[in-house]
Amino acid sequence: MNSRLIVTGTDTGIGKTVFSAALCHALGAAYWKPVQSGLEEETDSEIVARLAQASPQRILPEAWRLNTPASPHLSARLDGVEIRPEEMHIPATSLPLVIEGAGGLLVPLNDKTLFADLFAIWRIPAILCARAALGTINHTLLSLEAMRSRDIPVLGVAFIGEANEDTETTIAHLGRVKRLGRLPLLDDLSPEKLHHSFARNFHIDDFAGVAR
């Protein structure tokens, strides 16, 4: 069975999409963003296609494309629609698949359902992206508790940002979670530099053996 992985995060804007692009390139995976909020600027699917140097066939169409860059429940409301998670089915592909959530783990899809609730239904191993900056211990441990309370399989934590050895070690120990690696912030975010940085800081075997 083909590998499927979820990429989620402790917050919005922490680098999930850049990490997803690097992971897609490393695995030769397809990419799916179930909900895209905000269409005026480059979308996350377009960013991944560019940074992963992925063919159009590897970028699967979003289930929901919403105009306003906001939490999915609000963006949908402003568009006059309601996101129905029960109708959101994982697309079929012959490739490994990276699924990226929107915003943080507990972002609402509608008035009743959080993204984490959808992940709990899918039961696909999830990577939690976390900042390596001050405050991330609290955010990351809370996110891990939320995942485990829903029986979401946790593959590990991917840190993003400048090195903070004590913080990363503390989270791995107290959170009882695998420390997958750390993706540093790149001044020149080119596909080549991103691919090289990912290969230098992560072990592909930590991701390639996952199958559901």
UniProtKB/Swiss-Prot annotation:
Enzyme Commission no: 6.3.3.3
Cellular component terms per the entry's GO annotation: cytosol
Keyword Disulfide bond found: no
One GO biological process term: biotin biosynthetic process
The protein's required cofactors: Mg(2+)
Pathway info: Cofactor biosynthesis; biotin biosynthesis; biotin from 7,8-diaminononanoate: step 1/2
Catalytic activity: (7R,8S)-7,8-diammoniononanoate + CO2 + ATP = (4R,5S)-dethiobiotin + ADP + phosphate + 3 H(+)
Binding site for substrate: S37
Single GO molecular function: ATP binding
Subcellular localization: Cytoplasm
Residues reported in the UniProt entry to bind Mg(2+): T17, E100
Organism superkingdom: Bacteria
Gene3D superfamilies: P-loop containing nucleotide triphosphate hydrolases (3.40.50.300)
Record-annotated active site: K33
Family from the record: Belongs to the dethiobiotin synthetase family.
Quaternary data: Homodimer.
HAMAP family (UniProt xref): BioD
Function description: Catalyzes a mechanistically unusual reaction, the ATP-dependent insertion of CO2 between the N7 and N8 nitrogen atoms of 7,8-diaminopelargonic acid (DAPA, also called 7,8-diammoniononanoate) to form a ureido ring.
Name this polypeptide is given: ATP-dependent dethiobiotin synthetase BioD
Organism for this UniProt entry: Brucella canis (strain ATCC 23365 / NCTC 10854 / RM-666)
